[in-house]
Amino acid sequence: MLAAGLAAQAAAPRQTEADAYTRYELLGPETASFKIYYEITATTAGATHYYNPIRAGSTASDEAVYDAMSGKPLPFEVVTGAAARQDPMMARASDSMDYIKVTLARPVPEEGQGRIIIVKTYKDEKSYLRDPRDPKGIIFNRPLGIQRNEVVLPPGYELTGCNVPSQVLAQPDGRVAISFMHAGSGEAPLILHARADAPTGDAARPAALTGERSWEAPARQGPTERARLSERAHQDRDIVYFLEAPESHAFSLYHDYTEAQPGAHAYYNVVREGSTVSSPSAYVLDTGEKLNAQVMTGAQLAAAKINPGESVGASTPVVVIPFPPVAKGTSVRLRISETYTAPASYRLENGELVFDRSFGRPRNAVVLPAGWYLTDSSIPATVRELPDGRIRLDFWNDRPDNIDVLIKARRKQPN
């Protein structure tokens, strides 16, 4: 019986997750507390619960959980590690931790996602404290294991120190925030210093961002001020490229994209010049619902009186994916798959695989075809081997610009 139980436990799927993002709002320093908005996606197919560990040394209060798709509250309870282990997914739950056990709005679909937002307040006097050397200063010293984070200072505080390269972003109410992506392994050893020297209220509110472009870039190419000061870490579109045989010039890809704009009812992807597209498909990650996808030209869009949101040439192909209109306070996350053929971007040259492409999104990944080994990558990337032996490169770009990625690979020696 014991052997059978251990075998069943070993066969049970483990809790898996993706797309973690955390926003910390520092409350008044006298409270030693901060409010956390934790966005996380459950990815274990069939899962009906998600378990969020309560960090050791922190006291949690004011918890709430929401379904990101509908915006509706979700039921939850705080359980011990021993209680969490009753769920086969959590066989490795720690006795030293409590967990927030969330009941998901719907079972996670096969190859789908269950997106949730966990809100809680932590009190941790070791992480958030007054600066002993500065009577007006505060310190937020907290190693962060989540790779995408934002920390918002209390009203009236200016940022005086930040040891992790970060964006600095004024909030609409005048508070100052830092935002960063940590692409490496391990925790980001974040230490923030701030001082109560900034105004509050209307005097602190920033001017509205404009559409003006930088004088440094060509007038029609440079990003707008609004784009340059948008938060990179919270941008939710990530793309994975799967390179096929380089002689084919073809690569498939999928990109995940969340739409929360009320009334939005379609996605338009304008195909880059020099590329052709085929086999588009899409589905709703939240539910597994399949969506219709088609390729139309700019002329066909104009004839159908469809506005894709940007200027499109008459012969330019556009991938069009309609979906039910998004209601206010809700969102939908899509996975869109396509295959591109782009001889200028992907080719075999002098016996080498060459992939040369500009990436504008913060998170991009490239998977080499089977049988090839990596020799060059012009842009720093994390590299890992997939279970099937293919090599994956992950590019995280926390700057508000494109990265021009050049990858080269060679064939492996036959076994």
Q: Which residues does each predicted region cover?
A:
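Hydrophobic h-region of N-terminal signal peptides that target proteins for export
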Residues: 1-11
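Intrinsically disordered, low-complexity linkers and stems that provide flexible hinges
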Residues: 22-25, 132-245, 350-415
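Beta-strand elements of well-folded, non-transmembrane domains
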Residues: 28-32, 38-46, 55, 106-108, ...
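Solvent-exposed loop and beta-edge segments used for protein-protein assembly and interaction
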Residues: 16, 28-34, 43-46, 57, ...
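Early extracytoplasmic/domain-onset interaction patches
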Residues: 10-54, 134, 205-271
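Intrinsic-disorder/low-complexity, polar/charged segments enriched in Ser/Thr/Lys/Arg/Asp/Glu/Gln
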Residues: 21, 33-37, 46-50, 99, ...
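A surface-exposed beta-strand-loop module
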Residues: 60-65, 69-137, 172-206, 281-282, ...
